[in-house]
Amino acid sequence: PSYVSLDSALALHGLIPERVEEVTSVTTGVRRRFDTPFGVFSYTPLPPHRYAPGMAWHEGEGGPFLAATPEKALADKVWTDKRFSPASQNDFDAYLHEDMRMDPDQLAELDGEQLAAVCRAFASRKTDMLARFLGRSRRTHS
């Protein structure tokens, strides 16, 4: 099983400004990459207990597909990005706003309850810090 996530889902939801050339998905299987006439498809493994919640069906040109919600895509990205090792919540400011070029207003609109549910499923220090950072940002952004 797999669902569209990471950069592809972040772009789908308008959270990152860049055009994504590769369809990025998360799977309970193994890491894979396929170069096809239709494009490049990559699959990043995620442990089964971190696989849900946070997915929804979307209608695409080729039919319906399963994709991460904005909150799930962000948690998937943070958890799978091995280059990002936050020492504190403050590290998320540079990562989200400078490295990922995410708009603070759009981040403030994320569903806090859904993000908390996703982060609880991850049971990870990185995603817990993400939820706390975004909760703090929403309070100061209001």
Q: Where are the regions that the model predicts?
A:
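Short gly/ser-rich loop at a beta-strand->alpha-helix junction or flexible surface loop bordering the NTP-binding
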Residues: 1-50
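Hydrophobic alpha-helical interaction segments
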Residues: 54-142
